[in-house]
């Protein structure tokens, strides 16, 4: 069985979502998992109930089961690392985009903007960062766009004049098939980013090492 299929079936069988698989030099196999997401109810939003998050115990459980499954399939690796998504979490499907509406994301297009840039940005540009928004597509189906400003952000503690003209906003609409990569922007402010998931981590290398 292929590595992707083995890992995906094992993770799903335990009730988790597979976010990403990475194989690094030195035999490291890194698996990122998350809890299945459902849109919060209006009552939960009003009450400020946070999303559940992956814990160290979740990562340990997946690690143990993956060890067994990978051994059965004869997968060659030296170290297995299972963790929750970081602040640069990849966005893979419509549900991920729905989940993170309002967040700042980084996207990379498969092809440069070309004539569609219309002089607003470089025609060769493929990478963009902006706030993710949901929009209605031409056929009425849900669509997506990011919105950003090229104006520099005020520095911490800097006073902004009330007479200052609003910064010009740019918007880029897209469909998922146009994207090579999409991730949450790894932004941390002085107060700390509002976490969508809390870090869980489990590392196996001739034993189990689980940092706090």
Curated annotation (Swiss-Prot):
InterPro entries membership: Ribosome_maturation_RimP, RimP_C, RimP_C_sf, RimP_N, RimP_N_sf
Cell compartment(s), UniProt: Cytoplasm
SUPFAM superfamilies registered for this protein in UniProt: YhbC-like, C-terminal domain, YhbC-like, N-terminal domain
Entries under Pfam families matching the protein: RimP_N (PF02576)
Family: Belongs to the RimP family.
Name of the protein in its database record: Ribosome maturation factor RimP
Any one GO cellular component localisation term in the record: cytosol
Protein origin, superkingdom: Bacteria
Higher taxonomy: Bacteria, Pseudomonadati, Pseudomonadota, Betaproteobacteria, Burkholderiales
Record's function text: Required for maturation of 30S ribosomal subunits.
NCBIfam families the UniProt entry points to: PRK00092.2-1 (NF000929), PRK14642.1 (NF011235)
Keywords on record: Cytoplasm, Ribosome biogenesis
GO biological process terms held by the UniProt record: ribosomal small subunit assembly; translation
Signal peptide: none
């Amino acid at each position: 069985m292929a590595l992707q299929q083995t890992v995906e079936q094992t993770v799903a069988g335990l009730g988790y979502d597979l976010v990403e698989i990475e194989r690094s030099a030195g035999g490291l196999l890194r698996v990122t998992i998350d809890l299945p997401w459902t849109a919060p109810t209006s009552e939960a939003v009003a009450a400020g109930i946070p999303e559940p998050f992956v814990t160290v115990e979740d990562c340990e459980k997946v690690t143990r089961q993956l060890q067994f499954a990978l051994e059965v399939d004869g997968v060659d690796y030296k170290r297995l690392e299972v963790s929750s998504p970081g602040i640069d979490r990849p966005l893979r499907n419509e549900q991920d985009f729905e989940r993170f509406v309002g967040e700042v994301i980084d996207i990379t297009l498969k092809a440069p903007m070309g004539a569609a840039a219309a002089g607003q940005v470089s025609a060769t540009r493929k990478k963009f960062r902006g706030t993710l928004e949901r929009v209605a597509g031409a056929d009425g189906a849900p669509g997506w766009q990011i919105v950003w400003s090229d104006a520099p952000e005020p520095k911490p503690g800097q006073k902004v004049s009330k007479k200052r003209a609003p910064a010009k906003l740019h918007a880029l609409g897209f469909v998922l098939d146009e994207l090579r990569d999409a991730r949450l922007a790894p932004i941390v402010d002085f107060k700390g980013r509002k976490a969508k998931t809390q870090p869980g981590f489990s590392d196996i290398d001739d034993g189990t090492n689980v940092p706090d």
